[in-house]
């Protein structure tokens, strides 16, 4: 391998530094119709929160209008948003779950 080839390879390797993936906040938004107990159930079921943490998060949703339920890679965040919104519709609640980049 010539010196030129080796130099070119080093430059290429430096440019290929891996960046960590973007992370996304999954957010539950307040509405005037979804029962508090249902929000707690969603938080426990989809975000693996215990009863106390789910209750605290639900109260944050209730009083502040929204709460972050977790921070995930894009694919996992999208999956959680779809799962929560689908589960809410299946149970005839308008609960809305969204995501935003951190």
UniProtKB/Swiss-Prot annotation:
Biased composition (Basic and acidic residues): 1-18
Gene Ontology BP terms: protein catabolic process; proteolysis
Xref: Gene3D superfamilies: 3.30.1390.10
SUPFAM superfamilies: ClpS-like
Signal peptide positions (record): none
Residue ranges of coiled coil: none
Residues covered by region (Disordered): 1-21
Family stated for the protein in its record: Belongs to the ClpS family.
Assembly notes: Binds to the N-terminal domain of the chaperone ClpA.
Functional description taken from the UniProt entry: Involved in the modulation of the specificity of the ClpAP-mediated ATP-dependent protein degradation.
Protein's recorded name: ATP-dependent Clp protease adapter protein ClpS
Organism: Idiomarina loihiensis (strain ATCC BAA-735 / DSM 15497 / L2-TR)
Gene name tied to this protein: clpS
